[in-house]
């Protein structure tokens, strides 16, 4: 069977690399983390965590929905990354992205077969299943074409604006917002977080 371990960070919504490393061991097969916490706005150190996990032979899966489209999200040391389009990518619901490291694709067996992900000349029945050699192997049937069109338009907009420009603008707004909230007596979650871990999400009361 599979044993699931839940990471309980010392501070809510703030996961430090050392806490991840302390939880995994020689039996750990995969670690799954969000690139940014949806309440605290804390961005994890993806490269630091991913590099160490890889050195230990542990797969790294990232939920990137809170950073893709808002901040650069490195995947050099990530095996899988998924993100829906409807948040920071500004795209429609039911559209999204899935990144699978090239070296991992041969290890993953598609669970659904269809006319898109199989090599099947002339649609003649075959004795064996021969999957497409690239990411098409995971796209079995007709795609969400309208969603893809909308998603493509949103990506064109983001590329035109520039991801670094978007990230810089979000952090500039945060630098103005957080002191203003503190001055009014608000309690701001992780107000003192380094900008390398900050995002466009600010929670306060």
Model-derived features: positions:
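Pyridoxal 5′-phosphate
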Residues: 1-205
């Amino acid at each position: 069977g599979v044993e699931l371990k839940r990471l309980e960070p010392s501070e809510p919504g703030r996961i430090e690399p050392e806490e991840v490393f302390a939880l995994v061991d020689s039996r750990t097969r995969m670690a799954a983390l969000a690139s940014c916490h949806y309440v605290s706005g804390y961005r994890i150190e993806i490269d630091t965590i991913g590099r160490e996990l890889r050195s230990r032979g542990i797969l790294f899966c990232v939920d990137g929905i809170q950073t893709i489209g808002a901040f650069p999200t490195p995947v050099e040391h990530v095996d899988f990354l998924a993100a829906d389009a409807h948040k920071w990518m500004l795209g429609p619901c039911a559209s999204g992205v899935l990144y699978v490291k090239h070296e991992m694709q041969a290890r993953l067996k598609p669970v659904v077969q269809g006319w898109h992900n199989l090599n099947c000349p002339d649609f003649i029945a075959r004795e064996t299943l021969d999957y497409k050699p690239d990411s098409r192997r995971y796209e079995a049937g007709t795609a969400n074409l309208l969603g893809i069109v909308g998603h493509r338009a949103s990506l064109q907009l983001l590329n035109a604006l520039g991801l670094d420009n978007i990230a810089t603008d979000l952090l500039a707004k945060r630098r103005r917002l957080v002191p203003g909230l503190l001055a009014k007596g608000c309690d701001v979650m992780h107000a003192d977080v380094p900008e390398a871990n900050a995002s466009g999400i600010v929670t306060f009361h």
